[in-house]
Amino acid sequence: MIHARSHDELKALAADVIRLSRLLTRERESLPAAYLKDRGLREAYEAYYLPPNLVKIQALLRELAAHPGKLLDKDTLRVLDLGCGPGTAMLGVLEFFSAGKKRPRIEFTAVDHIAENLKMAGELVTKFKSTSDLDASLKTIRSTIEQAPHLPETAFDLIIFSNVLNEIFIHDEARIAKRTALVADLLNRFLADDGSCIIIEPALRETARDLLAVRNGLVDAGFPIYAPCLCHAACPALANPKDWCHEDIPWDPPELIQELDKLTKLRKDSLKFSYLIVRKDAKTLRDVHGEHVFRVVSEPLVSKGKIEFYICGEAGRKLITRQDKDETPGNDVFGRLRRGDVVGFENLIDEGRRYKISKETQVNRRTRT
């Protein structure tokens, strides 16, 4: 899939990476449904987008695996990948379980309306199985996601929408309501009572805000959010049209991606994406980290004499401030927080519209799962 390239081949690949990047960002409305049929775009995806997308799905599987209820500890794991594309999410699942102590039999069902995507997904799974003793099978179904509710009903332990929800009903003014209704229908039909649904979307403001709106609709429909949210209230980020919520994971990219970054002026030194993990039961990340915790939902806001973040928890989204003069060994980790961290506090001052850290405040950053 990835081989040593000459300088000219690398330049050609970089040009295709730029072309694909534009289609996935600024020119999203021009993105053809079957864009991976284009050989150049397909090679750009495999070289530049597939590796980080593996890391994203594995990060979310770790969040599920961290739960004391051992949510992924099954002898057989049935996985439904909706809009599977070339099989990236399935490869991420295979790599995750092949590296772990618990190695279930994995039964994949992959749904995509592009035959070439299903073929690539099959080749990817077959290639992985040839180098691993992990027991896995794959069933492919050619169908759009919109037609998926008509598939034979089977209870799946894991349902995945990876970078696909934003591509359906894209030009429809009622896209949020239609996406919400479709996801809710699919979860009601296909998600096991103790199963999980992972939804990954780009970190762009438009796609991330759309996902937050779908999140609110799913909560209203009775689906609890396992992660990243630490509360089930309406998402406060939607109150301001300039706000959105996304994850940002540190990442050391492989050499090829570093070379492509130099040629394209793009950056893959961290992994930005929006996501939801949805379940039917009431299990959440608070079972892992405790009830009174917050999620960091901004970059550090540094100004003269202080550092601030936005954090989100049971009371919604608020600014939290620590003045430099109040730094102590008990709260010094505050200055090293990153977007996405889960954090707890002792002796935190609640000023109503914001929180304040004093010399007496203890800051406890939870280990990233």
Where are these regions (language model features)?
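Conserved beta-strand signature within the Rossmann-like core of class I S-adenosyl-L-methionine
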Residues: D193-E201
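Class I SAM-dependent methyltransferase Rossmann-like catalytic core
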Residues: L31-H67
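S-adenosyl-L-methionine
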Residues: M120-H150
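A short SAM/SAH-binding and catalytic strip from SAM-dependent methyltransferases
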Residues: D157-I176
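Conserved SAM-binding loop of SAM-dependent methyltransferases across substrates and taxa
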Residues: P86-K102
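A short glycine-rich, Lys/Arg-flanked "PGG" loop and its adjoining helix->strand segment in the class I
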Residues: A177-D194
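N-terminal auxiliary segments of SAM/dcSAM-dependent transferases
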Residues: M1-L31
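C-terminal lobe and adjacent flexible extensions of AdoMet/dcAdoMet transferase-like proteins
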Residues: Q258-T369
